[in-house]
Structures are given as C-alpha cells and as structure tokens.
Amino acid sequence: MQGFSKKVQDVNNYSKVKGDLFIRLLNKKKHEKALENAVYKEVDGIACVLYMKVGQRDGCISSMKIHKASLADWGMDEDEAYENALANTYFLTPPRIYKWECLLFNPNYEGDDFMDMNYEENIVERNAGSCLSTSIRTNGAVAVFLPNVAQRIADLMDDDFYIVFTSVHEAMIHPKRIHWL
C-alpha cells in the first residue's frame, strides 16, 4: 500500500483513490462542526460520511473524511460519489449477521452471510437477538445502510424490525413482533 502522505496527495485523483473509499457513520449533532465540508448523507440524525482509507496496520484502519472540494476534481456529484463508496463498503466489508451467543463464546466466529440467497435461517427465533455488523466487525453499524441489507433482513424475518445501534461497530436487530418485550 502507498505511504500515508502519498495517499493524501492523491485524494483529488478519483482513479487512484476510488478503491479506498467507504462509508462510516457519525452522530450528526455531535460532529456538526467536523461535517461542515464533508461529503455525507443524513438518515435520521446519523451522518453516513464518505471516507478514504489512507493506511492499515495490524487490522486497524487509518482514514480521512472526503471534503466536498474533492468532488469537483473528481468530476462527480455527491450522490454519485456516495453511491460508489456505499457499494465499495459492501464489497470491502460485507454485512454479516452474528448470533449473539456465538459472539460471546467463540472469538473466531465469523458470522453468517445472510445476503447469500441460499441463506434461510430464521433470525427471528434467537433468544438473545441478532447482531448486525460487517465481516471485520469494525464500523459495522453501517451495514444496515448498505444496498439491499434492510430489505433482506425484513424478508428473512417476514416482518418489519427494530434496529438498536449499540456502537459504531454493530447494531442489534429485533423483529417488530417481539413477544417478550
């Protein structure tokens, strides 16, 4: 991977950075000042922000927000850049459903690829609920905003659902028709 400073210098060259663009969530109200020049879409107070990965080491990612000024250099509008980064996020860190009890007792548990059309497990009947994240379990709360994810969860549950953002790394999924609440 290119060095940090080289990546930052290339930020205005879309062809060089497009594979490193992804979406990360921030609380819009809490990060209002930092979002002034950033590229993002708001969903109910959550800012889905365009970032660029500038480095990675020992499983940790260094990144920077993309500013609106970069879009002019890229020759694209916010919607196009956002949609491209959203798709890229999906492929870089695919969404996964984790059985809560497996997460607690098995550190090597990799979750279920519920987006696979052959996946048919009932995610409603889990006593502890289902945890939505990504394949790397980092910044996984973004998974619900990835293409077709919310619809797939609703289809698997055969119901609407509640989502509880427990951190930026995951969200708990519960069917609307929970009987034990």
Where are these regions (language model features)?
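Extended, low-hydrophobicity segments enriched in charged/polar residues
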Residues: 1-124, 128
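C-terminal structured domains
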Residues: 126, 133-181
